[in-house]
């Protein structure tokens, strides 16, 4: 009942109005899986390749007809007749057929869409929700947890058209007793933040991930206005709500220095920028910092881990790009203590699960993440619960492409009840 009988690829539109790949996998029992590949703005140089057409007459060169053709042609032919329940085999067939180190032949967007669609179809054929099927693929059947959300309520960097250098300022509703309550707290703080910004005459337009994108005097001011909003919403900063940041520092790393254009082009060495961040953690209850230095600055990261690694969570995104080879090297060298998991960075579900397992086995945390270019596909919600990852980053409290994931988590929590505990701050490394 779970043999693949048909695979369809198509070009659809993501949350930024750019094309992406959607795949449909049909099984002989009439079961169907549908999945779409997300797309990033600030991307690590070692990510698997997102194949774009480059034809300037269509979608400004961003079309994905080549990737779609790969789905409908060689990929479909290779997986027809194969058992969708054998995820590792499906993914291996596609990866081997592609034959490149970074999936540049077919595109990680093509391979991932089929990989996820096959998993969804297999779950349907087993008569179980996707998160349950993922837990079985993960070798942890029946082991679930609800993730602590990191909600990106102020967007800067590559995610917004403003003068804020640091890409994401996030809140974590750690005082919540459930995922549903965490979403409510996040929503209330988000709405109070709008009032705080308006009172200061600041813009409340939103960025790619649904957070506000005002022009601010400094990066520290972003933390200050969030602190004000938390208080206005009736919560205590540090107790009910903690803070997190994604620096995406590779985006402002120029000629060996970290240059904050929004702060008068202040330039920092790796050590100086580490202490700049350390000062912020002393002023505000920041418990997690992602990509605090450039992806290639491993010596700097070793220093940053030494200074901050026993106090807070240091997440590698561009640093590790969900790649087990790079993560293994990072673990051996004691770089960071957490990995961001974006399945389109590596391009298949099997490899994503391997990265999560490697991180957990080494005592690193794993934070499941969206991309800035998303669709209504909410697979990452099931991935977070099915791997009991403990943390999720899926944007702010606006834009359906973000909220779709929170709504799916609410449904899953309702279905699982006490089988999926919400552990809050305990999930964060160093807390």
Curated annotation (Swiss-Prot):
What EC number(s) has UniProt assigned to this enzyme?
4.2.1.11
Question: Which catalytic residues are annotated?
Answer: 209 (proton donor), 342 (proton acceptor)
Name the positions where (2R)-2-phosphoglycerate binds.
Answer: 167, 342, 371-372, 393
Q: Which GO terms describe its biological process?
A: glycolytic process
Q: In which pathway does it act?
A: Carbohydrate degradation; glycolysis; pyruvate from D-glyceraldehyde 3-phosphate: step 4/5
Instruction: Kindly list the positions annotated as binding Mg(2+).
Output: 246, 290, 317
SUPFAM superfamilies cross-referenced by the UniProt entry: Enolase C-terminal domain-like, Enolase N-terminal domain-like
> Mind listing the GO molecular function terms for this protein?
magnesium ion binding; phosphopyruvate hydratase activity
Q: Which cofactor does it need?
A: Mg(2+)
User: In the record's cofactor note, how is the cofactor described as bound?
Assistant: Binds a second Mg(2+) ion via substrate during catalysis.
Per its record, the protein catalyses:
(2R)-2-phosphoglycerate = phosphoenolpyruvate + H2O
UniProt KW keywords: Cytoplasm, Glycolysis, Lyase, Magnesium, Metal-binding, Secreted
| Root EC class | lyase
One GO CC term on file: phosphopyruvate hydratase complex
Q: Where in the cell is it found?
A: Cytoplasm; Secreted; Cell surface
Q: What does this protein do?
A: Catalyzes the reversible conversion of 2-phosphoglycerate (2-PG) into phosphoenolpyruvate (PEP). It is essential for the degradation of carbohydrates via glycolysis.
Sequence similarity = Belongs to the enolase family.
Return the PANTHER family for the record.
Answer: ENOLASE
What quaternary arrangement does the UniProt entry report? Answer: Component of the RNA degradosome, a multiprotein complex involved in RNA processing and mRNA degradation.
Q: Could you identify this protein by its name? A: Enolase
């Amino acid at each position: 009942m779970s043999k693949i009988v048909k695979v369809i690829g198509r070009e659809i539109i993501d949350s930024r109005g750019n094309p992406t790949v959607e795949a449909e996998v049909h099984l002989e029992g009439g079961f169907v899986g549908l999945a779409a590949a997300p797309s990033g703005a600030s991307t690590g140089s070692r990510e698997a390749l997102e194949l774009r057409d480059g034809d300037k007459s269509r979608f400004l060169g961003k079309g994905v007809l080549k990737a779609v053709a790969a789905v409908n042609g060689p990929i479909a032919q290779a997986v027809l007749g194969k058992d969708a329940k054998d995820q590792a085999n499906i993914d291996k067939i596609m990866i081997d057929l592609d034959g490149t180190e970074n999936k540049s032949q077919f595109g990680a967007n093509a391979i991932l869409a089929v990989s996820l669609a096959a998993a969804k179809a297999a779950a349907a054929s087993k008569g179980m929700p996707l998160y349950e099927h993922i837990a079985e693929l993960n070798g942890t059947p029946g082991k679930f947890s609800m993730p602590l959300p990191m909600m990106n309520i102020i967007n800067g960097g590559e995610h917004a058209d403003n003068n804020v250098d640091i890409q994401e300022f996030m809140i974590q509703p750690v005082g919540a007793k459930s995922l549903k309550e965490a979403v409510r707290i996040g929503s209330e703080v988000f709405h109070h933040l709008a009032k705080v910004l308006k009172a200061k005459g600041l813009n409340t337009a939103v960025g790619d991930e649904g957070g506000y994108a005002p022009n601010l005097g400094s990066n520290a001011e972003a933390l200050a206005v969030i602190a004000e909003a938390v208080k206005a919403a009736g919560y205590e900063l540090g107790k009910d709500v903690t803070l997190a940041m994604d620096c995406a520092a590779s985006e402002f790393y120029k000629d060996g220095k970290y240059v904050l254009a929004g702060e008068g082009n202040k330039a920092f060495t790796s050590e100086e920028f580490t202490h700049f961040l350390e000062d912020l953690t002393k002023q505000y209850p920041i418990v997690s910092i992602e990509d605090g230095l450039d992806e290639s600055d491993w010596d700097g990261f070793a220093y940053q881990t030494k200074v901050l690694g026993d106090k807070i969570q240091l997440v590698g995104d561009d640093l590790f790009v969900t790649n087990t080879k790079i993560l293994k090297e990072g673990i051996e060298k004691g770089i960071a203590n957490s990995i961001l998991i974006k399945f389109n960075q590596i391009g298949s579900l099997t490899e994503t699960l391997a990265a999560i397992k490697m991180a957990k086995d080494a005592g690193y945390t794993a934070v499941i993440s969206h991309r800035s270019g998303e669709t209504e596909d909410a697979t990452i919600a099931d991935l977070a619960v099915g791997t009991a990852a403990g943390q999720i980053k899926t944007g702010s409290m606006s834009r359906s492409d973000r909220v779709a994931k929170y709504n799916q988590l609410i449904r899953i929590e309702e279905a699982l009840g006490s089988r999926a505990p919400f552990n809050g701050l305990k999930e964060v490394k160093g807390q």
